[in-house]
């Protein structure tokens, strides 16, 4: 199964999806902000990165930009809990231009996320 780096400032999201992904057989590494997430990826590259867009310290757009610049083959899924659809769609459009493979709006359907993981990081 896949090794996944999950970056989100919301501990509840990390806990919930950590359990779901681990329950599906994936290894999950978690970070609470973009700086920590980038540092973890540099030390321990994973098969897939899931990052929130809006976070303190370093937001998801900066994380995506930096990781895709330094690791152009990285597979990234961007997620957002923004309730402002035009802003969320703008960030998703830009993230896709930067190389993000899939985007999800919170709340995320666990089955849809697991399906995307299977597509992006097959065994």
Model region roles, listed by residue range:
Residues 8, 52, 80:
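Active-site residues of response regulator receiver
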Residues 11-29:
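Two-component/phosphorelay signaling modules centered on CheY-like receiver
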Residues 32-36, 59-63:
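Acidic catalytic/metal-coordinating carboxylates
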Residues 42-44, 67-74, 98:
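Conserved phosphotransfer cores of two-component systems
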Residues 44-50:
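Active-site beta3 strand of CheY-like receiver
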Residues 55:
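Receiver (REC) domain active-site loop signature in two-component systems and cognate sites
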Residues 62, 83-104, 111, 115:
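Alpha4 helix (beta4-alpha4-beta5 surface) of REC/receiver domains from two-component response regulators
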Residues 73-86:
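A short, hydrophobic beta-strand element within the central beta-sheet of small alpha/beta folds
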């Amino acid at each position: 199964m896949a090794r996944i780096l999950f970056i989100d400032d919301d501990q509840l999201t990390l806990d919930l999806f950590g359990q779901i992904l681990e329950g599906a057989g994936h290894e999950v590494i978690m970070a609470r902000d973009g700086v920590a997430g980038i540092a973890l990826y540099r030390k321990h590259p994973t098969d897939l990165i899931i990052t929130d867009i809006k976070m303190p310290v370093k937001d998801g757009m900066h994380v995506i930009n930096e990781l895709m610049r330094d690791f152009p083959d990285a597979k990234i899924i961007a997620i957002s809990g923004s309730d402002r659809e035009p802003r969320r769609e703008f960030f998703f459009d830009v993230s896709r231009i930067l190389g993000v493979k899939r985007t999800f709006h919170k709340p995320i359907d666990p089955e849809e996320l697991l399906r995307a993981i299977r597509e992006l990081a097959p065994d």
